[in-house]
Amino acid sequence: MKRLHVKTYSVLMILAALVWTQKLSAQTFEYPIYEDDDVRIEVKNKGARPTIADFATAIFDYSKEMEFFDKVYEDWKRYQQKKPLRHHGNFIVDIKNGFMSYKTPGAEANDTLYQEMCFWNCADAKHKLVACNVRWKMGEEYGWSEYVGCRFYLYDNVKKTMRVILPEDIGTLYDGNGLAAFFLPRKGKNIRVTVSSEGEQWDEVLEWDGYKFSTKQAP
């Protein structure tokens, strides 16, 4: 019986150490604040917590003056009002899994534009990380423009506002430079990335650890 108590005590000590390590990590990790960072995007939500629809509305409102986003902004408003969409687009809004996507034909016959959003709860319990991704499929290849790529926003749970955060500050090496196509997760926590370079193409995975991502080779 004494040996059993010793084993139980050892297990409890290990669990306590793991919890303490996680708490210590949460206390020491801080997201950077930039010197010229004075833009705060207000997120309005009716419930106790914001949903992916609330984040989408905030980002679309913030981006509506950009020519690229005017069509999705108009269709999003019509979708919320349960009206027919005008730009041959299609929305998937998965509130439970915190994911939304908008798919619409591009300018050319084989072009398709995808816009995706999702969010993660950060381990510090103070923030959420929101991703807004644009992917342009040209037949069997991926195209690029100044709008293609994944942009990230850091949401403050108390202030109910979010701000832009640079990809390199959360561990993502690809920031919309046209060499990578992002696929945000509808389920799970990791981002899949298809990278193209010098005629070659391969997949990588951005693994989420509660604060940031790390790049791994896709299985």
Model-found features: residue ranges?
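Terminal domain-start segments
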Residues: Q27-N121
